[in-house]
Swiss-Prot record:
Similarity annotation: Belongs to the ATP25 family.
GN (gene name): ATP25
Membrane listed as a keyword: yes
Keywords from the named record: Membrane, Mitochondrion, Mitochondrion inner membrane, Transit peptide
Species in which this protein is naturally found: Candida tropicalis (strain ATCC MYA-3404 / T1)
Protein's name in the database: ATPase synthesis protein 25, mitochondrial
Assigned GO CC terms: mitochondrial inner membrane
Keyword Ribosomal protein tagged: no
GO BP terms: mitochondrial gene expression; mRNA stabilization
Main localization (coarse): mitochondrion
The organelle targeting sequence, given as a residue range: 1-38
Amino acid sequence: MIARGRVLNDTALKSKAMFGFTVLKLVSRHIHHTPIIFQEKKDAQVDLGVPWYLRQENSPPVEEIKKVEIPELPESAPGSLSELVHLIAEEYGIVDVEVFDLATLPEDHPKSVDVQSYDKYIILGTGKSEKHLYKAAYELKQYIKHHHDCMPVIEGMVSNSIGKVARRRLAKRVSRGPPATHSTYGIGANTWVSCDTGVDGITIHMLTKERRQEMNLEQLYSDAPDYESNRYTNNIDDDDIFYGIKRGFHTSTRVFNKADQLKVVYDELLENGKTKSLAKFKAQFDNLFSGASVEEYNRKVDFYKVISLMDEQLVTAEQVECIFKDKYSSLLLAQEQGIDWHMEVTNDIIKYMELLADVGDQYTPAQKLNKLSEFVSDMTNFTGDSVQLFSIDKFNALLWNLTTKSTFNQLDSAGIREVINTKGKFEPVVGKVEQDAKIERCVKELTRRSLPKEVFPLWFREQMMYTYGQTGAWDKFWKEFQSLVQSIGSSKDRVYFWVTTLIFLSKVNNRDALRTYFTKYWSSPSGYSFLKDFEKNDNRFNSDNERIVFKRTVQDIQNSYGSSPWKDEAVEFVENL
């Protein structure tokens, strides 16, 4: 035994001298696991006729195979949902699978089927590694292609053929900007793979464990704001000596306290701010602002924007725009660790678009888009990576909004929903909206080409319809209206659409448009009509609020156009409600 150990130790030393530490580790591992044959005493139960490597005591312990957990699926779900869930869990090894039925979300939820009709079911799952996700995504793509005869749209799947040299070059490009240890910038590929299957409205998200903790998509697709948030968060005690190291920042506790103080001032401004007191609020905010965190800069953008909308002389739109530039040129933030700059850039582009939309008629549509183009160019140059803006619903909505010019915000689906929720007490301001026809065509085509299957979702077509109505383009309005009515699958949803359309027309208050609604679509014997869908929906509205607002809307139209016979049938209908 002693002689054998000396021989192997000598071999290890020679290996270290000739080949370095790698072979040394292999030899050491061999020494550790090699059984001792020359024992002074042998176990009496050992069968000497069996080679040592086949003996039971030298076999590794058998690990029990964990049973794959399949989440409970909605009863009304199509068979394809169960098929894909079992496929990724049982065949591809994706764990912690969760399924979200977007039809169960409330109407005002940003991911509900009432707001967007493309996604109906969301599947979330965790992969073991980036390579695992790449392999699973590749197999999933081939499976859907051959079994469902459609080509899924997959994002985040990057081939492993990117070599070390290319990755080093990407890293050098990123290093020119502030450090961003939590942002991939195209280097950490396949940490989040999204697959729009094209099958029954099913979208699959597969992420690594770390990426899933960071993104917390569960909150996005759940009605509960704190949905299992503790499941994918690290439990780090503030008193832990490694608190800062684990979080990846230096003095963030102090910084967050400062950001909280700024939030108090901001909330007080929203609640109690008046024109005469704006300067006092601004002075208080500026005195607290230190610029030591992205949270402070983000709060400053929101704060200054509110003041600018209330008093353009105190804070101009250009001053709000300068805050973004100050944020990305800050030396303090450049030294801060743990900032997801990719996420910050995406959010700031959206905020900048909101600013351009809120300034009213200060800029023409062409000027707005030129300013947006310059801003996006500056931001993407900073990140060193492209930002997939057209995959964000709010970006598409705001981009369409920027094709118009108006002194007030347009009436949209959110405003109409507020009218219903308040039983008609909310009165939106509606007036003339101008739209640049050339820019409208360009933005519409650009958006269409960027969408899956180049098909506009229903919510976007509804937004276009509302814009056409407020710009007076009634031919386009009724074209979109007819297309939407035909695309809505159930009579229940169409009843809601009939209600919202009438509310919109009553607020715009165009006589010809109202007459078209009541003469062509109220009780048409051929094609779609309100009365047909109302009867199919068991002669009822979807809520008491809808019934109350619909009745009041028809009565208001009667008061405005009392002598016109084209709405008499509707007036008689609501009298019996």
